[in-house]
Amino acid sequence: MNFTSNQLRDFSTLFSRSEVNRWLKGDFNSIDIKLERYNLIEKNKGNSYLKFLRNTYHILEKNYPNEYVLKNEFLNKWLKKELGTNNSAIFNEFRIGKAIADLAMFNGISKVFEIKTILDKEYRLSNQIQEYRKIFNEVYIIVPDVLLTKYSNYDESIGIITFDSNSKNFKIVQRAKRNKELNPETLMEVLHTKEYLEITEEYYE
């Protein structure tokens, strides 16, 4: 079955944090809406919501490089191996002031990762990086390899990681320069007390 870019974009909204929270509460209304919208009710008759979500994920994986798919590939197959350890603490959608980082990793050195797919605009990136520098030692952006030239001269202090069209292969093109001038007040504001204690006890004592 062929899907338009609008349909794929619509499917990708199923994997946002807010939607996952709704599933955990037993609310699957958004899935029902999409099944009806794209005449998929009969095709999925007898299937569980979980099976539909798995099938949808595979469709997105092959056809639509959205952030959810990239995060899974990046986390599961690359990040800890290349830039962390098995004991690294990783947080998804980590809020810093008005910005929300795609991924944050703590393992003695704090690192933040901002994903920019081929569908994303860069107009917010400058402000995001400014916020990230307040509490992270290293800032990385993850971009499609076809857009490397566009981002390569963006900021020489940030690291650049590229991924291919299949969202499978990641490569460090430029390592981030270490930032030691952190803002302790901002750090205390953005971390929940429990998270802060766990991180400091595990990595900074």
Residue ranges and their predicted role:
Residues A89-N92, I115-K121:
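Short, flexible loop segments at the rims of nucleotide/cofactor-binding pockets, characterized by
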Residues L103-M105, I109-L119:
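Conserved catalytic cores of phosphodiester-cleaving nucleases, focusing on short active-site segments
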Residues N107-I109, D164-S167:
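Short acidic-glycine loop/turn motifs at beta-strand connectors
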